[in-house]
Regions:
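N-terminal leader segment of winged-helix/HTH proteins
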Residues: 1-26, 72
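Amphipathic, non-transmembrane alpha-helical scaffold segments
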Residues: 8-12, 16, 55, 99, ...
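Short, locally clustered residues in the helix-turn-helix/winged-helix DNA-binding domain
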Residues: 12, 37-43, 103, 130
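N-terminal helix-turn-helix DNA-binding core of bacterial DNA-binding proteins
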Residues: 17-61
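Charged, amphipathic alpha-helical coiled-coil/dimerization segments
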Residues: 68-126
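C-terminal regulatory/oligomerization modules of transcriptional regulators
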Residues: 119-146
Length: 146
């Protein structure tokens, strides 16, 4: 079986193209927009370290773009209770309309991406993806026990 490793890059590029008009309007770099949407869509992740580890964005880019989002009033930094070393990133009220518009773009992108794919095929894709994730977890688990 031959995998097309360009697939993930193509999704990323196409998604960025869909976000470009909003980013341009807001004068936000794509990375800043991605950080804002990541924090809004994944409330379990709250720190710059989370963004680096989960989104795989380089630390210096996270730092610069978080500063921009804070300075523009889209994010606030709040100290983490019981751990002075950590700072939690919180979306502000001002970010609400941006997040709402971003989610509409994401929903439309998903709709367009899955055009021509019926519910049964989506269900099968979900099952396949879950199995691939389980397989990767098992590979990681085995490697960590060596």
């Amino acid at each position: 079986m031959k995998f097309n490793f360009e697939f993930a890059e193509k999704i990323s590029r196409t998604y960025s193209d869909e976000c470009r008009p909003l980013c341009h309007e807001l004068k936000l770099p794509q990375t800043a927009f991605d950080i804002l949407m990541f924090l809004a869509n994944n409330p379990e992740y709250k720190t710059a370290r989370d963004i680096v580890e989960i989104r795989k964005i380089k630390a210096n880019l996270v730092s610069v773009n978080v500063d921009k989002l804070v300075n523009e009033g889209y994010l606030e930094r709040k100290p983490v209770e019981n751990d002075r070393r950590k700072t939690e990133l919180v979306c502000t009220k001002k970010a609400g309309t941006v997040i709402e518009r971003g989610r509409r773009i994401q929903q439309q992108f998903t709709t367009n991406l899955f055009a021509g794919i019926d519910e049964e095929q989506k269900k099968q894709l979900t099952i396949f993806m879950e199995q691939l994730e389980n397989n990767m977890d098992e590979i990681i688990r085995r490697k960590s026990h060596k």
